[in-house]
Amino acid sequence: MSGKELRYGFTTGACAAAAVKAAAQMLRDQAMVREVELMLPCGIGANFQVHGGVLRDNTASCYVVKDAGDDPDVTNGAEIHVTASIEFFTKNEIKIEGGTGIGRVTKPGLAVPVGAWAINPVPRSMILEVVKEVFALRCIPATLTFSISIPNGEELAKRTLNERLGIVGGLSILGTTGIVKPISAKAWTDTVDASVDVALACGARTVVLATGRSSEIVAQKHLSLSEEAFVMMGDHFGYAMRSCASKGVPEVVVAGQFAKLVKIACGHEQTHVTSSQMDLDALAWWLREVPATAHLEQMAREANTARHLLEASGYNKALIELVCSRVLKVCADVAPWMKARVMLAGYHGDLLYFSP
């Protein structure tokens, strides 16, 4: 490892609020703005460079380029545009609207109501605060409208889970702290929470927690459930289980391929770990204790990977049932009051096991 310290970045919400502040200052002062300072919800002050400023009559527009730091965020480098307009001698009002590349919410269960622009509560609050700050001393009755857009937002959104959550037409303006931690799991766990909320709001009684897209596809082929019922948990097994339990999900199906299920069976609540040999050693001990699988103990100790063991065993039924039963035990330990089932997806798109 190089030891290089990873850079933090800024959320779309922080960038939108910065662009709004710049556009508001341009309207107020009728002058260009090159940089704005913003106090983020986490209590940190940050400076944002402002680009593309245009002043025309009672409108002002500009944009801020999102810097996600060292986080692999699909929105890194995206331009967050804002057009501000003022209409004098009307009621005092601040309007926040979405434009090109900003999604609309079409499913219940999210922090934003159905039909509204996908601008989450914290960014919306940030925007209102900066507008009030800029126009604090102006008492002229006026309506201020701020339209947020991301030119390539609709295309970028295809690389996110927005469509699955029912956010169509573009990206969301997100963020609770204003900063993005590099290589952070929070974006993923936030999406897990939102996905479970949407599933419940759409009437799902069973939620499928998939470790990856391949296992999710297998589950979708074999379960007659609405698309909202399928939640991509990735490596966040423990978090996803507790999210479902805390929100009152009656039943979960944990769907994964063999290697991931072995990690869960070994008690890893976060399955992105590098203890593969330790997992196989633990599995070897379990195999030894069961007469039907005792002959596989040495094979497990010599296997390179969990997948290698599965294939070398000839997809041994007792081996598969042993691992899945261990997964169910871990599920019961994590969320004892929630019913759980396990689905083992094969590496070639087939279903290998589904617990009753």
Curated annotation (Swiss-Prot):
One of its GO terms (biological process) is anaerobic cobalamin biosynthetic process. Its EC number is 2.1.1.195. It comes from the Bacteria. It catalyses: Co-precorrin-5B + S-adenosyl-L-methionine = Co-precorrin-6A + S-adenosyl-L-homocysteine. Gene3D superfamilies: CbiD-like (3.30.2110.10). Pathway: Cofactor biosynthesis; adenosylcobalamin biosynthesis; cob(II)yrinate a,c-diamide from sirohydrochlorin (anaerobic route): step 6/10. GO terms for molecular function: cobalt-precorrin-5B C1-methyltransferase activity. Transmembrane segments: none annotated. The keyword RNA-binding does not apply. Keywords: Cobalamin biosynthesis, Methyltransferase, S-adenosyl-L-methionine, Transferase. NCBIfam families: cbiD, PRK00075.1-1. Belongs to the CbiD family. This is Cobalt-precorrin-5B C(1)-methyltransferase. It comes from Geobacter sp. (strain M21).
